[in-house]
């Protein structure tokens, strides 16, 4: 299989890339890793007349957290859209600041695909089963988009409109992903997180995925929680309702079971040749329970924050 003929440009700056997008509009596609776009072009599912290579733009390569945080702020961790998934996976600052993303990245394809794929590319591609997109929604990340008119922001939870469809305009480029940090835990509390999924084969797109991040007090009561499900809806789903349900409760088997049952009531999956709707509901219940248990265990073995 071969793609249709196209023109190729490699802008030296982000401003040049935005100018090219403004000129060519829907006829142009950005390429950084090409992990998703190139196969689609080979199958002629995507037929861009122009391919704009942004893989070497330094403006898109940042991994940054504030050196000092005010007492009343959780802070923000900024990841450039062009950062390779393998770089993010190995970066010590990223692993310490965004442990949930570090766990999710292990499930993304294979080592070879993570060596090419970028954080921003996965988010913009819009696959409902994408691990990175799910974590961005669960952690309530903010996406910075840029065009010739300047920068704008959109919440990750509002970015996805339908399968493979996002709110980004043809002339816009995703530049940064801003993750709110859980940086100021209460005295004596601990935090934990987990990501899990089920697929037909290792490295395949998930039939259903789930993730959770929790903060527990010394007695095991939940102080804060975020939960999400992927692959069981037209969009990656953050479920703040589940977090609210867990806050104040002791995170024991009963509370986890109630949350897992509630998760099923919040989704309406569709069946396909890979899995029926009922099977996806079953997987959602199992995976939500599993990630909450694993996150609880992770928190229980973490070092408590001193009062």
Question: Where are these predicted regions, by residue range?
Answer:
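C-terminal structural segment of proteins
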Residues: 1-307
């Amino acid at each position: 299989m071969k793609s249709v003929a196209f023109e190729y440009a490699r802008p030296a700056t982000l401003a040049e890339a935005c100018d090219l997008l403004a000129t060519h509009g829907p006829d142009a596609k950005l390429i950084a890793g090409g992990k998703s776009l190139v196969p689609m072009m080979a199958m002629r599912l995507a037929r861009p007349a122009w391919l704009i290579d942004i893989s070497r733009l330094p403006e898109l390569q940042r991994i940054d957290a504030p050196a000092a945080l005010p007492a009343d702020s959780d802070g923000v961790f900024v990841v450039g859209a062009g950062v390779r998934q393998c770089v993010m996976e190995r970066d010590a600052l990223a692993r310490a600041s965004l442990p949930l993303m570090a766990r999710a990245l292990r499930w993304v394809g294979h080592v070879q695909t993570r060596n090419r794929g970028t954080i921003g590319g996965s988010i913009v591609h819009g696959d409902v089963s994408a691990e990175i997109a799910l974590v961005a929604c669960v952690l309530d990340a903010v996406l910075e988009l840029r065009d010739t008119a300047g920068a704008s922001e959109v919440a990750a939870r509002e970015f996805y409109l339908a399968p493979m469809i996002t709110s980004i305009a043809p002339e816009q480029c995703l530049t940064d992903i801003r993750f709110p940090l859980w940086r100021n835990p209460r005295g004596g509390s601990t935090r934990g997180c987990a990501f899990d999924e089920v697929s037909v084969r290792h490295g395949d797109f998930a039939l259903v995925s789930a993730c959770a991040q929790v903060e527990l007090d010394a007695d095991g009561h939940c102080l804060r929680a975020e939960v999400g499900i992927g692959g069981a809806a037209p969009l990656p789903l953050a479920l703040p309702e589940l977090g609210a349900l867990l806050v104040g409760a002791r995170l024991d088997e009963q509370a986890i079971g109630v949350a897992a049952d509630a998760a099923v009531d919040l989704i309406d999956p569709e069946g396909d040749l890979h899995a029926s709707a009922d099977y996806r509901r079953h997987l959602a219940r199992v995976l939500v329970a599993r990630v909450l248990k694993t996150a609880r265990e992770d928190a229980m073995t973490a070092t408590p924050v001193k009062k």
